[in-house]
């Protein structure tokens, strides 16, 4: 089992009408790793919104025929989703569109609100009717409520930020503007750049800017609101520095693509540093260093360089497996379908295996078994994340301690359960080796949450309540 991140957001503002849908398509492709459940694009054609969104991967949802039906425009927003609140159905696909007395908007969101349940209850008591089970709709309602009293959409967003707690990187489109905002803690990444023709591009990661030929300008600061119009860019920073930065450290460990740079730090380099630290804190006498594709590869190189032990490609990932159907009674075989060992690398050798995390322990146990079947003499597991001990409320699917193996077993017990000869985790106190500073969120490892978490609150309970209500909702036709 791997931890999943909620989603990726993308937006574009051009000086003249252009094929912005295709730009979003390329941007979503670059962000596909952030969400594989659904995706969507909304194009602004002279104030009229045209959208398409559905369940599936980017290339499944946006065929050539679909893209040809989306008009040219000067603004567009896009989203790729892995749901951490809200069921997997078409109603929860983003971007979400909202009509109100002063106009309309489309919103794409990465993250989770830690006060979503309380805000939703408050809104329902005041008469709000929800069409989704996603907390993104709660954000949309809060912004809409403020917009009815505010002189501009950006002012409404600023006022809404006084109410929202938790993680949110937002890209919002109105008839005339593209607005992006990042929560004051900066839990989730957000950056922007510019193409040669002057078009602005906003994305969760810098790799998506490169995918459309945009030059990276900078990250959106925690608490910052960027307003993009046909006349240029304006920055509002009234919420900046109201909180201490707390970017999710797991962005560097696993979520982000290695070719991205987040808050000035190369993801590729951060993973190599984590591997090098593991070589110092958990040395072992072996013959070869092997990384688990994909995020374990950079760390394995770092481990090899720091230890002097040769690096070898010991596992090959099937890049074409996609969302292949696997029968429920054959789930144990899915690792064999996704990964294949290279016998020549591991046979008769002592192997140190580098991976990014252990959640339930089932996947890494099967990988260890694969390598043993390929002839590995010893397998020593090294992990670039500390043990997961606490739920995450800021945009991942770790919703309780129930499925976290480290909550129920000691490290020696886990080592025995996965079948390794030894097991070593990156110490919590060494997480700064990834970033060079301590301004990050590591609540899932240490239980120290930057925001207030209501007593007894859990995303699973919130999800259950919304899902029960979801069964009573009428069918939703969408905006296509």
Language-model regions, residue ranges each:
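Conserved short alpha-helical segments that host acidic/polar catalytic motifs at enzyme active sites
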Residues: 1-222, 227-286, 292, 378
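Flexible loop/turn segments at secondary-structure boundaries
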Residues: 84-85, 115, 179, 187-188, ...
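Secondary-structure transition/capping motifs at alpha-helix termini
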Residues: 128, 149-150, 283-287, 305-312, ...
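A conserved beta-strand->alpha-helix junction
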Residues: 132, 137-141, 311-322, 417-435
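Amphipathic alpha-helical
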Residues: 141-151, 293, 301, 305-323
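PRPP-dependent phosphoribosyltransferase catalytic core
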Residues: 161, 176, 213-219, 240, ...
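Extended, hydrophobic alpha-helical segments in both membrane/secreted and soluble proteins
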Residues: 289, 296-303, 307, 311, ...
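Short, glycine/charge-rich flexible loops or terminal/linker lids adjacent to PRPP-binding catalytic cores
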Residues: 308-352, 361-362, 390-399
């Amino acid at each position: 089992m791997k931890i999943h991140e909620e989603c990726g957001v993308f937006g574009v503002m051009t000086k003249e009408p252009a094929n912005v849908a295709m730009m979003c398509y390329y941007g979503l492709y670059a962000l596909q790793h952030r969400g594989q459940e659904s995706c969507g694009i909304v194009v602004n054609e002279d104030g009229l919104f045209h959208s398409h969104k559905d369940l599936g991967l980017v290339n499944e949802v946006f065929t050539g025929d679909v893209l040809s039906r989306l008009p040219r425009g000067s603004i567009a927003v896009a989203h790729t989703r892995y749901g951490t609140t809200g069921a997997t159905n078409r109603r929860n696909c983003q971007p979400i569109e909202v009509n109100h007395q002063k106009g309309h908007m489309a919103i794409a969101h990465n993250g989770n609100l830690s006060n979503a349940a309380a805000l939703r209850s408050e809104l329902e008591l005041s008469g709000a009717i929800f069409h989704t089970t996603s907390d993104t709709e709660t954000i949309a309602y809060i912004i809409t409520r403020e917009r009815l009293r505010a002189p501009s959409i950006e002012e409404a967003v600023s006022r809404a930020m006084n109410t929202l707690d938790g993680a949110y990187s937002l890209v919002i489109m109105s008839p005339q503007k593209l607005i992006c905002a990042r929560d004051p803690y900066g839990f989730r990444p957000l950056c922007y750049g510019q193409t040669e023709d002057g078009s602005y591009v906003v994305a969760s990661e810098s790799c998506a800017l490169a995918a459309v030929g945009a030059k990276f300008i900078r990250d959106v600061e925690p608490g910052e609101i960027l307003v993009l119009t046909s006349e240029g860019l304006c920055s509002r920073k009234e919420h900046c520095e109201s909180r201490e930065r707390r970017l999710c450290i797991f962005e560097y460990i696993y979520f982000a693509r290695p070719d991205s740079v987040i808050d000035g730090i190369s993801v590729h380099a951060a993973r190599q540093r984590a591997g090098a630290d593991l070589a110092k804190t958990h040395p072992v006498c072996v013959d070869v260093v092997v990384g688990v594709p994909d995020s374990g590869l950079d760390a394995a190189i770092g481990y090899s360089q720091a230890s002097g032990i040769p690096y070898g490609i010991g596992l090959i990932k099937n890049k074409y497996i996609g969302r292949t159907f696997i029968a429920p009674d054959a789930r144990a075989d899915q690792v064999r379908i996704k990964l294949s060992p290279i016998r020549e690398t591991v046979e008769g050798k002592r192997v140190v295996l580098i991976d990014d995390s252990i959640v339930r322990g089932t996947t890494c146990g099967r990988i260890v078994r694969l390598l043993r079947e390929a002839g590995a003499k010893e397998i020593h597991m090294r992990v670039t994340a500390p043990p997961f001990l606490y739920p995450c409320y800021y945009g991942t699917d770790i919703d309780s301690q129930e499925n976290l193996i480290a909550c129920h077993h000691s490290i020696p017990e886990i080592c025995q359960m996965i079948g390794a000869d030894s097991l070593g985790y990156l110490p919590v106190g060494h997480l700064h080796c990834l970033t060079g500073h301590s301004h990050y969120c590591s609540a899932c490892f240490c239980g120290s949450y930057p925001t207030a978490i209501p007593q007894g609150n859990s995303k699973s309970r919130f999800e259950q309540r919304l899902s029960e209500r979801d069964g009573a909702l009428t069918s939703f036709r969408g905006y296509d």
